[in-house]
Amino acid sequence: MTMITDSLAVVLQRRDWENPGVTQLNRLAAHPPFASWRNSEEARTDRPSQQLRSLNGEWRFAWFPAPEAVPESWLECDLPEADTVVVPSNWQMHGYDAPIYTNVTYPITVNPPFVPTENPTGCYSLTFNVDESWLQEGQTRIIFDGVNSAFHLWCNGRWVGYGQDSRLPSEFDLSAFLRAGENRLAVMVLRWSDGSYLEDQDMWRMSGIFRDVSLLHKPTTQISDFHVATRFNDDFSRAVLEAEVQMCGELRDYLRVTVSLWQGETQVASGTAPFGGEIIDERGGYADRVTLRLNVENPKLWSAEIPNLYRAVVELHTADGTLIEAEACDVGFREVRIENGLLLLNGKPLLIRGVNRHEHHPLHGQVMDEQTMVQDILLMKQNNFNAVRCSHYPNHPLWYTLCDRYGLYVVDEANIETHGMVPMNRLTDDPRWLPAMSERVTRMVQRDRNHPSVIIWSLGNESGHGANHDALYRWIKSVDPSRPVQYEGGGADTTATDIICPMYARVDEDQPFPAVPKWSIKKWLSLPGETRPLILCEYAHAMGNSLGGFAKYWQAFRQYPRLQGGFVWDWVDQSLIKYDENGNPWSAYGGDFGDTPNDRQFCMNGLVFADRTPHPALTEAKHQQQFFQFRLSGQTIEVTSEYLFRHSDNELLHWMVALDGKPLASGEVPLDVAPQGKQLIELPELPQPESAGQLWLTVRVVQPNATAWSEAGHISAWQQWRLAENLSVTLPAASHAIPHLTTSEMDFCIELGNKRWQFNRQSGFLSQMWIGDKKQLLTPLRDQFTRAPLDNDIGVSEATRIDPNAWVERWKAAGHYQAEAALLQCTADTLADAVLITTAHAWQHQGKTLFISRKTYRIDGSGQMAITVDVEVASDTPHPARIGLNCQLAQVAERVNWLGLGPQENYPDRLTAACFDRWDLPLSDMYTPYVFPSENGLRCGTRELNYGPHQWRGDFQFNISRYSQQQLMETSHRHLLHAEEGTWLNIDGFHMGIGGDDSWSPSVSAEFQLSAGRYHYQLVWCQK
């Protein structure tokens, strides 16, 4: 044990937080989570241990701008200015200094290992009592599961130790410091330490005791570590559970270890042995260790699909059977290996349906509770995710237990990121930083290696490639050869990774960056000598309205076996709740706390909002990742299961044939598909509709029974095919009514019954419509070529740093947002049964024509207005965001009804999950409340739209809401939007894709850009 003087002054003088060689003082060795049961039955059933006591709750807290400002008296008693805060928590969420959001840039001046003298410091204290029996015998430990970023600990005025690495436990022996009666803990937490240079992750920078604190009482002679692993024969019919147990304390000949394996209440195997390890070298073996091997016949294998778990109980006892203590863990029998270029689980090639997950809560910051963790897992499972990457640090220890039990594959990642260094490997190639890096990797492995859900270790994130990585890679491979290691830094395919694990590599497009090229994922596989599997550690940047082109990745994954999936970036928007002057909550992002530097809304890349409400993109991910694939041939549906281990024992296939959303026939067939098997389903003779319309076949896989992660009726997969389009020629009903045209100097006015249409001859636009005496328009019907920029359109561009390559900057520079219409033609003709208005406009900016739009409006005796639009795009202007029409309707109706793709928001490059049907939703549901407002709510493939008294027919895309594109473009946060008068309608003949391969470079694939020179579309507008 390191002994230093107890005084605060000496601790401050040492400045351990600016010494990369000092990562801890007096911290105990890492190990799996302990409970020290004194009853083996309680260990087997995982009941709360009487030896484990939570210290979570109210602590006293005082904040200081720097550690030097902390008075020495605080070690002995609480300060007058001390407040009460809840532990665990981040102190910024209680109003003490500010959270800082940055992606790459360090939030402090880069001068490792030194940190600013203005180093916010939180002083926590707690008084508590311990059981008298704990003082008389054994060892009492205190466990801090997570403290950001470094801390010193005192107990009863005496210095205990020091710890850093905010994402792994720091555990100390308190036995020598405790006394009878009341005890007092004092914890001085520093916001910045040399460890902060290794924690430059893309997240909010927050501080404090943000994970659980507990006391653990162990006997003097105790289990100090245990490690379980499973081995198999070739066909997995026989297994061996290897359990290596280590003890500390007085080694006696009468000590024994028993390891028993349980399946529920049934003991599967058991073994007992004295201590004394196998011979290691010429000096012998470990006297304080023993390895037991238990044979298991026909083990039930663990996978994310079927997370079968056993329970291993490790007992330390005397020769006569007297129990000293027991530890336990869940055991999953599974094997991970790479063979023939494939990542295999239990001999089957995995397809990783993964997502990156930060630990984030909108109210509690980086504090995770069990309810939120379970909610995340259920949502992931319900949306066909089978894997999660702990980005970019070891998670709360409970997370792994839950992943074991519910079934998720985990990439466990070391808390190392030096993204803001230039070059990135400045620290990771420096031997002075090897001890700090080593502790972050080795302690992660020692804590988490008993979890079957952990199938891959990661050396960290975005830290370049240095010699320290190579050393730690070799250490892991030596200590735990049962799992592969991945690491993206330095090019994603270095010697420090078993898996090619790029981030944001594209399917077919190379990105030849100097030194670290990102090849297309297809090309990467074929590089000379390359035999490893490829799994994208990050892809499909889901920032705001994004995930365009996701289907392209999944086509490639299913086509090329060594492309074994990836991890979407990322799971949850990292917005935080703030309150306005009236106490109303709103969602904040970088800069909203006065934090500098900051990276604005770049913290919001989630498939779900911070409150776990899904983004529309989540449905696209669910559909592309679904475990059942379908092929239609004639009357036969071929269903293919992508489950590797699960037989379809809880699935029904519902099928329905509908004509323009009207059901004509339906049925239900139980699915009986073996893992990786197929089932052919013969449909009956389908009805032949007599009326016109599109005939669609829709299949949905429904789970009739609830599961551990889904309710009864859960839909896990679906597909839709258009069978036919019945065409009919319907002659207009004979009408003696003929629209009447009136011409004035200013307008063309057409009247028919109680309806009127007014075209302004000076502007050439439809300026007003009346039904009776009620005006229908608040703004004219005009061409529209722009959209409120998406995050993907903006990229890295900002006011102080313009990226001319970003779509929005190209559109601005070309004048798309500022273009004004010059009237070229506006004429009216009376036909035999209709009035025809013909217009032409040149949309210009600074004298340059960007678009020419020609329209005809044909208003017939039935009151229908048929609109035909032809648009020419200048060859030297950027591809436009949309080609469509826009107006502000006077009505605000409660509901929107349409025949087209839905129900969720969809875009041309993100619509595979949408189904063609007749949909009816509240107007409010047509708007997607992205925290950073942008273009949203589009519905593609629309043949009919009904809103209020109006109906539109044709083949178009639309969005409709209370917010104009202008307001969306000019507003920084969704809570600042105000419902405008009437309703804004955008009807597009064509709309550019949204992209999403990444969010900092133009990522809309060429096939989804509006690159043609001419466009033509038609629609009919009438009143019901």
Curated annotation (Swiss-Prot):
The active site is at E462 (proton donor), E538 (nucleophile). Na(+) binds at D202, F602, N605. Gene3D superfamilies: 2.70.98.10, Galactose-binding domain-like, Glycosidases, Immunoglobulins. Changing F602A: Decreases the stability of the loop 794-804. Keywords: Glycosidase, Hydrolase, Magnesium, Manganese, Metal-binding, Sodium. Binds 2 magnesium ions per monomer. Can also use manganese. GO terms for biological process: lactose catabolic process. Its EC number is 3.2.1.23. The record marks W1000 as: Important for ensuring that an appropriate proportion of lactose is converted to allolactose. It catalyses: Hydrolysis of terminal non-reducing beta-D-galactose residues in beta-D-galactosides. InterPro entries: B-gal_small/dom_5, Bact_Beta-galactosidase, Beta-gal/glucu_dom_sf, Gal_mutarotase_sf_dom, Galactose-bd-like_sf, GH-type_carb-bd, Glyco_hydro_2, Glyco_hydro_2_AS. Its cofactor is Mg(2+); Mn(2+); Na(+). GO terms for cellular component: beta-galactosidase complex. PROSITE patterns: GLYCOSYL_HYDROL_F2_1 (PS00719), GLYCOSYL_HYDROL_F2_2 (PS00608). The record marks H358, H392 as: Transition state stabilizer. Changing D202F: Obliterates all binding and catalysis. Changing H358 to D/F/L/N: Less stable to heat than wild-type. Causes significant destabilizations of the first transition state. Inhibited by phenylethyl thio-beta-D-galactoside (PETG), isopropyl thio-beta-D-galactoside (IPTG), L-ribose, D-galactonolactone, lactose and 2-amino-D-galactose. Induction: By allolactose. Belongs to the glycosyl hydrolase 2 family. PANTHER family: BETA-GALACTOSIDASE. Homotetramer. NCBIfam families: PRK09525.1. This is Beta-galactosidase. It comes from Escherichia coli (strain K12).
